[in-house]
Amino acid sequence: MNLFDVADFYINKIVTSQSKLSVANVNEHQRIKVLLLDKNTTPTISLCATQSELLKHEIYLVERIENEQREVSRHLRCLVYVKPTEETLQHLLRELRNPRYGEYQIFFSNIVSKSQLERLAESDDLEAVTKVEEIFQDFFILNQDLFSFDLQPREFLSNKLVWSEGGLTKCTNSLVSVLLSLKIKPDIRYEGASKICERLAKEVSYEIGKNERTFFDFPVMDSTPVLLILDRNTDPITPLLQPWTYQSMINEYIGIKRNIVDLSKVPRIDKDLEKVTLSSKQDAFFRDTMYLNFGELGDKVKQYVTTYKDKTQTNSQINSIEDIKNFIEKYPEFRKLSGNVAKHMAIVGELDRQLKIKNIWEISEIEQNLSAHDANEEDFSDLIKLLQNEAVDKYYKLKLACIYSLNNQTSSDKIRQLVEILSQQLPPEDVNFFHKFKSLFSRQDKMTQSNHDKDDILTELARRFNSRMNSKSNTAENVYMQHIPEISSLLTDLSKNALFRDRFKEIDTQGHRVIGNQQSKDIPQDVILFVIGGVTYEEARLVHDFNGTMNNRMRVVLGGTSILSTKEYMDSIRSAK
């Protein structure tokens, strides 16, 4: 269930593909390859493989199939890696009618229909195609246990309750691709109260049934895997709160787009650091720190800089030929370390700057208190003071009011007081947004709470899992991390085979039928959590920690239609019809 292993397997399959021409006909030139991508697979490759890794396999040219100005290079072998969309297929058909390269080996990132294959064959008059193969990576791998489809709600929903036709097809196909890449045929559970979850669950089940003999004929496992489909709006608090761990803070305050961090707007940033790559697969320091809170991160950065200084001093002692030889041997590693130190110093410095200028320390503490406590007078008083503070940005005032409304829907007098202050502090469109937000989530069914509500005391597993976030602790860390995302309780319930049956319906993919409130027989070993409406990096941290706690007894992968920052989540609500 390691997504990086999935990526390596498929990328290796593409780049090591052998020519179908006879060995005698393969000259030096034909060993050199061109990789032809489309707009969908270009980011997939960039997330999973570096340029140097491609060069190792004699791929010296990477091109886009949409580019009609490519030169004719018949001496080159072309590895095509594209998504089987109608748009890409049209480009591919044109390519084969007038081939620019000597040989084509085509890899599709998802299932190809029989009619698509027939159209390809009809266009290949010169028999340039020597291989067509389906591989299954129609999604973006961000962490070893996190994936995204990088789709915004406007791209897949007609309104907040109804799928668009194209959006449903995209999400279904990509989710099927995830299942095939992990080689699992799961039972599907979904939030019964959510129409969009129900529709997606049934579409995925239909696709599994349709392709059962061709693609889903996997060996029977000891316990049936589970695909759990969730609706983002059943836990609106988590994506509203300011995050405090490294990866999630970078996404919140700077932005991470497919592993690229844009630092160009950071004051006095070095030109070489304006755009940097941040990948836990390739950056050991980031892999070690991505889930640390800001306090722990500071200590790690200091250690990292100290290590760099020590290596610098060691390498600077060049008094002999042997020293020069050693320096030259170590220089690539030293240079890489030097660049990495500068990158992380720049990122951490910018995070610290933004925390200060935006008053995040004060805002976040109140956010956490509002999310953790119901109808607390002291919290309300602190909220009013912050709303009336001219130094606090209007965006954070609106967000704080929304957070308060989620836990205090029955406090009508206080809500009225809140609206009065918002009307004085915010523009009319923001006040209207607050009313829209309050209306949207006031109808939220209380059954979204897990069955652990009946027993307030978490299991020992959950207690260990969430020990750092225990709100009774007085440490600074816990003040800013009191809120426990709902995914935590769902994981605990799954690990005990105790999902709330009145909330989650189940489709048995063996019989392709909804089986309602029946108790499943076994605790699943492999679980995919998929959230329609997006997931947060804070939830990704919880899943990662949970996997570590379970030590392979249960393996969880988290995915969503997108990765959310607080602003992106609020924007999605603002634009919802």
Swiss-Prot record:
Keywords: Cytoplasm, Membrane, Protein transport, Transport, Vacuole. Its main location: cytoplasm. Coiled coil: none annotated. The keyword Amino-acid biosynthesis does not apply. GO terms for cellular component: cytosol; Golgi membrane; SNARE complex; vacuolar membrane. GO terms for biological process: cytoplasm to vacuole targeting by the Cvt pathway; Golgi to endosome transport; Golgi to vacuole transport; Golgi vesicle fusion to target membrane; intracellular protein transport; positive regulation of SNARE complex assembly; protein targeting to vacuole; vacuolar acidification. InterPro entries: Sec-1-like_dom1, Sec-1-like_dom3a, Sec1-like, Sec1-like_dom2, Sec1-like_sf. It is found in: Cytoplasm; Vacuole membrane. It is a peripheral membrane protein. Signal peptide: none annotated. GO terms for molecular function: SNARE binding; unfolded protein binding. PANTHER family: VESICLE PROTEIN SORTING-ASSOCIATED. Essential for vacuolar protein sorting. Function in membrane traffic between the Golgi and the vacuole. Interacts with PEP7 and TLG2. Belongs to the STXBP/unc-18/SEC1 family. Present with 5660 molecules/cell in log phase SD medium. This is Vacuolar protein sorting-associated protein 45. It comes from Saccharomyces cerevisiae (strain ATCC 204508 / S288c).
